[in-house]
């Protein structure tokens, strides 16, 4: 009897091994086939993506199988592409060629890290959840823009090891910006940081309209139209600022002025992080642990009004930050910890929408206003790479001249050899 049971057990083990191996082989073959298909179709641009989506329509559940999801991300060059269905160029020259053929302007994202990886900078991750999957935004982008992204530099990552097998992985510091370029690659406008979905769509529609108008002109007329546009935007921001504060009972609002941040001070990850609320909520605990609060941030342009007033301003734009059903479905698919209960998930979503609304008003009234001013002055705005250098140095406070992104504070003693800094011999020799 024991021998019979042993034979049966051994038989079940062999059968399990056989079926597991067969399943593994089938999954590997499927992955290889889908990968090859994605590589081939990517060469066809957005048409290739449409072909893939049509041929795999029955596989595009929410979320799809890991194999289909990975293939789509490779084809689109965007993480969670199954939710947005957007095709991105990673070569600006190819994007410009597509723009000239289609007559569409370019939306060029600059970010820390890569858009097709999970751990890109925080704002770009929020774009992938709140903006790109939004049904209205994704359709508008698909129909009216050529999409492109480019890495500014690798995103800093932090791993907290609890010593028992548990780890907490996060990115830290950095910001992102969308540039609107004409089909020759010249900057028309820029949308700095995170905006709520409705506010972002409004920006896209405004910039697409001026891009269309500019495409019909050249020379001095082009220059005049672009300056008139930015002058109107500046006036509109100032008028809206007064109207919003008046609605809050502030009859003599402070004037929006040039960015008063002291650029001679050493770069600070704490100060840079304070510019983007959504990402600072995630990163602040880690930054506070790494970098003691010793710097004077009184010159921060955000101090033009107090935090309580910023919060009240954000409440006026709460509806502009509402997530649509596609974005909420993507959040649910990501299986966040401690959000199995529907009430907990709703709370997470409400909190996210609240900080998005705050980001929206601060980015528009402080950062975008400054960008309009630069365009009006023709201050490093004719070349997207030069403009991007200026934005990251003077608006985002993460200049390319600082390899440590404000995280290495030479004025604070931490009792670690070499301050805990480990340099790459290759980067040191540059």
Q: What do the PLM-derived regions correspond to, one by one?
A:
Residues 2-10:
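Bacterial N-terminal signal peptides that target proteins for export
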């Amino acid at each position: 009897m024991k021998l019979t049971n042993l034979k049966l057990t051994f038989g079940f083990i062999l059968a399990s091994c056989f079926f597991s191996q067969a399943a593994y082989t089938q999954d590997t073959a499927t992955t290889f086939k889908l990968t090859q298909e994605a590589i081939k179709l990517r060469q066809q641009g957005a048409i290739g993506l449409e072909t893939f989506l049509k041929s795999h329509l029955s596989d595009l559940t929410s979320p799809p199988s890991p194999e289909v999801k990975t293939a789509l991300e490779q084809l689109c060059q965007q993480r969670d592409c199954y939710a947005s269905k957007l095709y991105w160029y990673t070569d600006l020259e190819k994007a410009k060629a597509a723009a000239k053929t289609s007559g569409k302007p370019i939306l060029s994202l600059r970010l820390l890290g890569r858009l097709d990886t999970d751990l890109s900078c925080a704002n770009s991750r929020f774009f992938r959840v709140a903006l790109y999957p939004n049904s209205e935004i994704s359709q508008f982008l698909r129909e009216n823009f050529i999409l492109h992204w480019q890495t500014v530099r690798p995103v800093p990552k932090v791993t907290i090891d609890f010593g028992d097998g548990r780890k907490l992985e996060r990115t830290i510091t950095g910001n992102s910006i969308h540039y609107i370029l004409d089909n020759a690659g010249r900057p028309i406008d820029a949308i700095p940081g995170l905006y709520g979905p409705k506010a972002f769509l409004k920006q896209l529609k405004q910039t697409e309209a001026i891009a269309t108008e500019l495409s019909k002109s050249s020379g001095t007329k082009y220059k005049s139209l672009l300056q008139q546009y930015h002058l109107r935007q500046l006036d509109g921001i100032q008028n809206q600022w007064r109207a919003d504060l008046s609605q809050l009972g502030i009859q003599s609002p402070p004037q929006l002025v040039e960015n008063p941040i002291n650029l001679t001070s050493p770069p600070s990850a704490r100060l840079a992080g304070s510019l983007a609320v959504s990402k600072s909520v995630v990163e602040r605990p880690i930054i506070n642990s790494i970098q003691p609060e010793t710097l004077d941030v009184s010159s921060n342009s955000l101090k033009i009004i107090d935090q309580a007033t910023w919060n009240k301003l954000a409440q006026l734009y709460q509806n502009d930050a509402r997530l649509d059903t596609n974005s909420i479905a993507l959040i649910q698919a990501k299986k966040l910890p401690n959000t199995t209960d529907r009430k907990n998930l709703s709370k997470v979503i409400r909190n996210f929408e609240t900080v998005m609304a705050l980001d929206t008003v601060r980015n528009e009234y402080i950062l975008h206003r400054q960008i309009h001013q630069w365009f009006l002055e023709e201050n490093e705005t004719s070349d997207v790479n030069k403009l991007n250098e200026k934005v990251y140095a003077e608006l985002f406070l993460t200049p390319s001249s600082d390899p440590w992104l404000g995280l290495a504070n030479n004025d604070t003693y931490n009792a670690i050899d070499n301050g805990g800094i480990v340099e790459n011999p290759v980067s040191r020799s540059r």
